[in-house]
Amino acid sequence: MDSQPSWTHVHEQNRKAWDRLVDQRNRFARPASDQDCHDPLAAVDGLGWLGGNIEGKELLCLAAGGGRQSAIYASAGARVTVVDISPGMLELDREVARERRLDIHVVEASMDDLRGLTAQSFDIVIHPVSTCYVPDVVKVFQQVARVLKGGGVYISQHKSPVSLQATIKPGDAGYVIQSPYYSKQAVPKVSGTSLREEGCLEFVHRWEEIIGGMCRCGFVIEDLVEPMHAKPESPRGEFGHRAQFIAPYLRIKARRREQAVTPSSDSNHGELWLPQ
């Protein structure tokens, strides 16, 4: 089977951007700490969505290079594979695996093209905030559905659509919507903010695409939260101030259906897509 990714200009630009962010020691390019690995599930699963024990589970860290996610889940006893588009980010995973003597399988690929991974081979997929870097989020969900076992858990995080649409700094009228909701174009680039990754192309995904797309790809959503980052005392225009008005991201717990479910006759979306 051909395992080479199908690069587009979006993939290539974001790949290069993340390699630069590694060189700049971006906050997402910092490997797990001793404290993280000492009590790993406390570091990443405060909501208890993983049930308190992942020993021996086949776990995919998707679009999650950087040496943190993979090391934490491997320290918790999971058999970890980490996928990322950036060679620089993946090198951090290799380094932390050597330093901590962890068994971590590293794969360079895009989240929307996992042809190099075996179907139904994972019990858990962990997917940090990253779907904004691909134009079509449904392709990502299709790939996850293919590699996840029936009954498997998919925990993902996504930038809020309105957060990507809105201005980073407030004007006289406060934070305003500047990018259209129905658009396939990348949002305007900005710099100097933790809400965006400099040099990357990012795309707004509608709620229908995130929630509906996930359901139509064979998942049942079990929980959804918007982590609280609002800080009333934050100066105007700072991250905590903006978060009072706009949730920066959401976290979803979904489970892969064991069997196909036939869509209702009044569905406007055609047949349910099922992984092969």
Residue ranges and their predicted role:
Residues 138-153:
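A short glycine-rich, Lys/Arg-flanked "PGG" loop and its adjoining helix->strand segment in the class I
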Residues 201-225:
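Short alpha-helix
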Residues 112-125:
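A short acidic, Gly/Pro-enriched loop at the edge of an enzyme's catalytic core
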